[in-house]
């Protein structure tokens, strides 16, 4: 017999939404500052346009390749690992002296932006069935908030 997972408190549900917002926003912070990044690296619009394009392509690839792991492994563990992967991409972008390394870091960041898609599955096992729709809505709002705030 397996032990019942601990139920989430209302505060924990909202903190998961904040986490979803933060990890989602990481993939979108480049958009409002793309001109500044292009000037910093001394490149034109065509070259800098690859950065968000590859980030989003890597996100799609991450959804295709990494998200199914949530069916076999702990969503909590995967969320932690993928968030660490995001941090690695962010560190690479921060330390990049050239556009190539910056682009690789951004691509890794996109690839590991899977946590927002794992959090609803994690939460669904830890809330009462009658609260599932409400909690899913809170987490979805966190993802949308992250996308919108990152673009400001």
Q: What does each model-found stretch correspond to?
A:
Residues 15-45, 63, 116:
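Extracytoplasmic
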Residues 23-24, 52-55, 59, 86, ...:
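Structural signature of transmembrane alpha-helices in multi-pass secondary transporters
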Residues 28, 56-64, 114, 147-148:
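Residue-level signature of mid-helix packing/kink "hotspots" within the transmembrane helices
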Residues 31, 63, 138, 143, ...:
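Glycine/proline-centered helix-kink
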Residues 44-52, 136:
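Juxtamembrane helix-start elements in MFS-like secondary transporters
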Residues 61-97:
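Conserved MFS/SLC helix-loop-helix module at the cytosolic interface between two early adjacent transmembrane helices
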Residues 89, 100-108:
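Paired small-residue
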Residues 105-141:
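Cytoplasmic helix-loop-helix junction between adjacent transmembrane helices
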């Amino acid at each position: 017999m397996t032990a019942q997972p601990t139920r989430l408190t209302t505060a924990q549900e909202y903190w998961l939404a904040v986490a979803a917002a933060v990890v989602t926003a990481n993939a979108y912070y480049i958009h409002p500052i793309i001109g500044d990044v292009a000037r910093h690296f001394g490149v034109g619009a065509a070259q800098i346009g690859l950065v968000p394009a590859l980030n989003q392509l890597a996100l799609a690839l991450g959804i295709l390749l990494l998200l199914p792991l949530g069916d076999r492994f702990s969503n909590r563990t995967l969320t932690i690992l993928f968030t660490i992967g995001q941090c690695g991409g962010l560190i690479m972008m921060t330390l990049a002296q050239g556009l190539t390394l910056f682009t690789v870091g951004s691509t890794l960041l996109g690839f590991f932006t899977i946590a927002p898609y794992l959090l609803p599955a994690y939460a669904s096992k830890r809330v009462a069935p009658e609260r599932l729709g409400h909690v899913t809505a809170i987490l979805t709002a966190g993802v949308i908030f992250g996308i919108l705030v990152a673009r400001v």
